[in-house]
Curated annotation (Swiss-Prot):
Residues recorded with modification Phosphoserine: S26, S349
Keywords: Acetylation, ATP-binding, Cytoplasm, Endoplasmic reticulum, Kinase, Lipid metabolism, Nucleotide-binding, Phosphoprotein, Transferase
Region of interest (Required for interaction with PIP5K1A), residue spans: 69-75
An example Gene Ontology CC term for this record: nucleoplasm
Catalytic activity field: a 1,2-diacyl-sn-glycero-3-phospho-(1D-myo-inositol-5-phosphate) + ATP = a 1,2-diacyl-sn-glycero-3-phospho-(1D-myo-inositol-4,5-bisphosphate) + ADP + H(+); 1,2-dihexadecanoyl-sn-glycero-3-phospho-(1D-myo-inositol-5-phosphate) + ATP = 1,2-dihexadecanoyl-sn-glycero-3-phospho-(1D-myo-inositol-4,5-bisphosphate) + ADP + H(+); 1,2-dihexadecanoyl-sn-glycero-3-phospho-(1D-myo-inositol-5-phosphate) + GTP = 1,2-dihexadecanoyl-sn-glycero-3-phospho-(1D-myo-inositol-4,5-bisphosphate) + GDP + H(+)
Residues bearing PTM N-acetylalanine: A2
Name the UniProt record assigns to this protein: Phosphatidylinositol 5-phosphate 4-kinase type-2 gamma
InterPro entries cross-referenced by the UniProt entry: PInositol-4-P-4/5-kinase_C_sf, PInositol-4-P-4/5-kinase_core, PInositol-4-P-5-kinase_N, PInositol-4/5-P-5/4-kinase
Gene3D superfamilies: 2-Layer Sandwich, Phosphatidylinositol Phosphate Kinase II Beta
Major subcellular site: endoplasmic reticulum
Function: Phosphatidylinositol 5-phosphate 4-kinase with low enzymatic activity. May be a GTP sensor, has higher GTP-dependent kinase activity than ATP-dependent kinase activity. PIP4Ks negatively regulate insulin signaling through a catalytic-independent mechanism. They interact with PIP5Ks and suppress PIP5K-mediated PtdIns(4,5)P2 synthesis and insulin-dependent conversion to PtdIns(3,4,5)P3.
Enzyme class: transferase
Cellular location(s): Endoplasmic reticulum; Cytoplasm
Length: 421
């Protein structure tokens, strides 16, 4: 796209999204909300500001074009770009020169639909208020203001891996009807500010947008070097590992039917990863203590969330959109407020798709959030070299983390099958 001097876009009002009901509900038509322009917040960080400006621009552009009847091979290679030079509008919000690129926009649009996430809700959840910076194992990690989406800064190699596996991933999501423990990839972007490229991957948050997690584990099924460091353990919410899980005699207390469904889904997902020669993935386990969660907490400081951006600064002037599926203006998690209040430990499974409540009569009243993470590592020459080095160090029979994809999968599934009471 040719260079241009343009004002920043505002996000269109939220429209579209899931219908009422609890459990795995399907979308139902509702009355339209009165549309209000949703302002993109003022970002102190130029990178975040450009990213959210770009997402608003992208969703506006997509809204002008009907979804394709079917995706073509070229859709998995496509991208949309915009370059802005000599930008003087709202200089406190955006740098004067920047570029934004969205990878495979029609593919991710289709994936969002298959994961029952409306584009307008996606936009509002990302752009209405500032995302929070949170701790990640590597790279930058942001969480949307409503805690439904995570934005992970990844490497160019990760983007290349995503590109090479995106067609297979999409086919798998179609085949399983979006019912999976894999990460729900919702958008992939490049942001260029001051001649530096940053790559952002947007996913659904595996944890709840309203139930806080009190304990967290990253489980790989390996026992070598799989204990949280002392530095990690003193954090408010440390990421504990396999040895910590065993040493604490931790167990997951869910019903037999839920366990059966979960393990069948996990096995199917892992078999898919083996086909792609992917390994080194983990099961992310978050535990919400219902008793602890029902205790009143002190209110924290109120964040400044007002935007300084004018509501009329629309890129290319697309109109605010009204969808046939009404949602509240708060984004992905917002519609829930129009239904009955949720009690302690209750959740909306249409939003908290990775959640399972503990069984009746379990010794602990808990909610578990379980999903697969770090699924981009393929078994290549680098991994083979690491495996050889670890074999020399620990011996061929040691429970080391770096093994062949088939071995990794078997060890992983065996370990996870034993985390349940």
């Amino acid at each position: 796209m040719a260079s241009s001097s343009v004002p920043p876009a505002t996000a269109p009002a939220a429209a579209g999204g899931p219908g009422p009901g609890f459990g795995f509900a399907s979308k139902t038509k509702k009355k339209h909300f009165v549309q209000q322009k949703v302002k993109v917040f003022r970002a102190a960080d130029p990178l975040v500001g450009v990213f959210l400006w770009g997402v608003a621009h992208s969703i506006n552009e997509l809204s002008q074009v009907p979804p394709p009847v079917m995706l073509l091979p070229d859709d998995f290679k496509a991208s949309s770009k915009i370059k802005v030079n000599n930008h003087f509008f709202h200089r406190e919000n955006l740098p004067s020169h920047f570029k934004f690129k969205e990878y495979c926009p029609q593919v991710f649009r289709n994936l969002r639909d298959r994961f029952a996430i409306d584009d307008h809700d996606y936009l509002v959840s990302l752009t209405r208020s500032p995302p929070s910076e949170t701790e990640g194992s590597d790279g930058r990690f942001l969480i949307s203001y409503d805690r439904t989406l995570v934005i992970k800064e990844v490497s160019s190699e990760d983007i290349a891996d995503m590109h090479s596996n995106l067609s297979n991933y999409h086919q798998y999501i179609v085949k399983c009807h979006g019912n999976t423990l894999l990460p729900q990839f919702l958008g992939m972007y490049r942001v260029s500010v001051e001649n530096e490229d940053s790559y952002m991957l947007v996913m659904r948050n595996m944890f709840s947008h309203r139930l806080p997690v009190h304990r967290k584990y990253d489980l790989k099924g390996s026992l070598v070097s799989r204990e949280a460091s002392d530095k990690e353990k003193v954090k408010e919410l440390p990421t504990l590992k396999d040895m910590d899980f065993l040493n604490k005699n931790q167990k997951v207390y869910i019903g037999e039917e839920e366990k059966k469904v979960f393990l069948e889904k996990l096995k199917r997902d892992v078999e898919f990863l083996v086909q792609l020669k992917i390994m080194d993935y983990s099961l992310l386990l978050g535990i919400h203590d219902i008793i602890r969660g029902s205790e009143p907490e002190e209110e924290g400081p109120v964040r400044e969330e007002e935007s300084e951006w004018d509501g009329d600064c629309n890129l290319a002037g697309p109109p605010a959109l009204v969808g046939s599926y009404g949602t509240s203006p708060e984004g992905i998690g917002g519609y829930i407020h129009s239904h009955r209040p949720l009690g302690p430990g209750e959740f909306e499974s249409f939003i908290d798709v990775y959640a399972i409540r503990s069984a009746e009569g379990a010794p602990q009243k808990e909610v578990y959030f379980m999903g697969l993470i770090d699924i981009l590592t393929q078994y290549d020459a680098k991994k083979k070299a690491a495996h050889a080095a670890k074999t020399v160090k620990h011996g061929a029979g040691a429970e080391i983390s770096t093994v062949h994809p088939e071995q990794y999968a078997k060890r992983f599934l065996d370990f996870i099958a034993n985390i349940f009471a």
